[in-house]
Amino acid sequence: MSDRLDDDTISDRLPDDWIHDGDAITRTYTFEEYLDGVAFASEVGDLADEAFHHPEITIRYDEVEVRFTDHEAGGVTSQDIELARRTDDRR
Protein backbone atom coordinates (compact mmCIF):
# COMPACT_ATOMS: atom_id res chain seq x y z
CA MET A 1 0.00 0.00 0.00
CA SER A 2 1.23 3.48 -0.85
CA ASP A 3 1.19 6.31 1.64
CA ARG A 4 -1.45 9.03 1.30
CA LEU A 5 -0.05 12.32 0.00
CA ASP A 6 -0.72 15.63 1.75
CA ASP A 7 -2.54 18.44 -0.07
CA ASP A 8 0.62 20.44 -0.83
CA THR A 9 2.36 17.45 -2.38
CA ILE A 10 -0.70 16.66 -4.47
CA SER A 11 -0.86 20.26 -5.71
CA ASP A 12 2.84 20.20 -6.63
CA ARG A 13 2.66 16.88 -8.48
CA LEU A 14 -0.82 16.96 -10.01
CA PRO A 15 -0.72 16.85 -13.83
CA ASP A 16 -2.30 19.71 -15.79
CA ASP A 17 -6.08 19.58 -16.17
CA TRP A 18 -6.51 17.23 -13.20
CA ILE A 19 -8.52 18.42 -10.20
CA HIS A 20 -7.88 17.48 -6.57
CA ASP A 21 -11.37 16.74 -5.26
CA GLY A 22 -11.43 15.68 -1.61
CA ASP A 23 -9.81 12.26 -1.35
CA ALA A 24 -9.44 11.82 -5.13
CA ILE A 25 -8.09 13.35 -8.32
CA THR A 26 -10.32 13.66 -11.37
CA ARG A 27 -10.18 14.70 -14.98
CA THR A 28 -12.84 14.88 -17.66
CA TYR A 29 -11.81 14.20 -21.25
CA THR A 30 -13.97 15.39 -24.16
CA PHE A 31 -14.55 13.41 -27.35
CA GLU A 32 -16.32 14.25 -30.59
CA GLU A 33 -17.58 10.70 -31.02
CA TYR A 34 -19.14 8.51 -28.33
CA LEU A 35 -17.23 5.40 -29.39
CA ASP A 36 -13.92 7.27 -29.18
CA GLY A 37 -14.68 7.88 -25.51
CA VAL A 38 -15.61 4.23 -25.02
CA ALA A 39 -12.33 3.12 -26.62
CA PHE A 40 -10.38 5.53 -24.40
CA ALA A 41 -12.15 4.22 -21.28
CA SER A 42 -11.19 0.69 -22.31
CA GLU A 43 -7.53 1.72 -22.70
CA VAL A 44 -7.59 3.34 -19.26
CA GLY A 45 -9.14 0.16 -17.88
CA ASP A 46 -6.32 -1.93 -19.36
CA LEU A 47 -3.71 0.46 -17.94
CA ALA A 48 -5.32 0.36 -14.50
CA ASP A 49 -5.66 -3.42 -14.55
CA GLU A 50 -1.95 -3.79 -15.32
CA ALA A 51 -1.21 -1.61 -12.27
CA PHE A 52 -3.90 -3.36 -10.19
CA HIS A 53 -5.22 0.08 -9.22
CA HIS A 54 -8.69 0.67 -10.59
CA PRO A 55 -10.23 4.13 -11.08
CA GLU A 56 -13.85 5.08 -11.36
CA ILE A 57 -14.57 5.70 -15.04
CA THR A 58 -17.79 7.44 -16.06
CA ILE A 59 -18.73 7.47 -19.74
CA ARG A 60 -21.14 10.10 -21.02
CA TYR A 61 -22.11 10.91 -24.60
CA ASP A 62 -19.11 13.15 -25.34
CA GLU A 63 -17.09 12.87 -22.11
CA VAL A 64 -15.17 10.37 -20.04
CA GLU A 65 -14.44 11.20 -16.41
CA VAL A 66 -11.59 9.37 -14.67
CA ARG A 67 -11.27 9.43 -10.87
CA PHE A 68 -8.31 7.99 -8.98
CA THR A 69 -8.08 7.41 -5.24
CA ASP A 70 -6.63 4.78 -2.94
CA HIS A 71 -9.31 3.51 -0.59
CA GLU A 72 -6.84 1.64 1.62
CA ALA A 73 -4.66 4.74 2.06
CA GLY A 74 -7.69 6.98 2.49
CA GLY A 75 -6.77 9.44 -0.25
CA VAL A 76 -4.44 10.22 -3.12
CA THR A 77 -1.13 8.36 -3.40
CA SER A 78 1.91 8.52 -5.66
CA GLN A 79 0.40 5.68 -7.68
CA ASP A 80 -2.68 7.81 -8.39
CA ILE A 81 -0.51 10.66 -9.67
CA GLU A 82 1.53 8.31 -11.85
CA LEU A 83 -1.57 6.69 -13.32
CA ALA A 84 -3.04 10.13 -14.02
CA ARG A 85 0.08 10.93 -16.07
CA ARG A 86 -0.09 7.61 -17.88
CA THR A 87 -3.79 8.16 -18.56
CA ASP A 88 -2.96 11.52 -20.15
CA ASP A 89 -0.41 9.74 -22.35
CA ARG A 90 -3.24 7.58 -23.75
CA ARG A 91 -5.04 10.68 -25.00
From Swiss-Prot:
Please list the reactions this protein catalyses: (4aS,6R)-4a-hydroxy-L-erythro-5,6,7,8-tetrahydrobiopterin = (6R)-L-erythro-6,7-dihydrobiopterin + H2O
Q: Which residues cross the membrane?
A: none
Domain of life (superkingdom): Archaea
GO MF annotation list: 4-alpha-hydroxytetrahydrobiopterin dehydratase activity
EC class, as a word, reads: lyase
EC number(s) on record? Answer: 4.2.1.96
Single GO BP term: tetrahydrobiopterin biosynthetic process
Taking the record's annotation, the residue ranges forming a coiled coil are none
What InterPro entries does its record include? PCD_sf (IPR036428), Pterin_deHydtase (IPR001533)
* CDD domains given in the database record: PCD_DCoH (cd00488)
- Please give the positions of the paired cysteines in each disulfide bond: none
Q: Which UniProt keywords apply?
A: Lyase
A Pfam family that the UniProt record links to this protein: Pterin_4a
UniProt lists the family membership as follows: Belongs to the pterin-4-alpha-carbinolamine dehydratase family.
Its name, as the record gives it, is: Putative pterin-4-alpha-carbinolamine dehydratase
Species: Halobacterium salinarum (strain ATCC 700922 / JCM 11081 / NRC-1) (Halobacterium halobium)
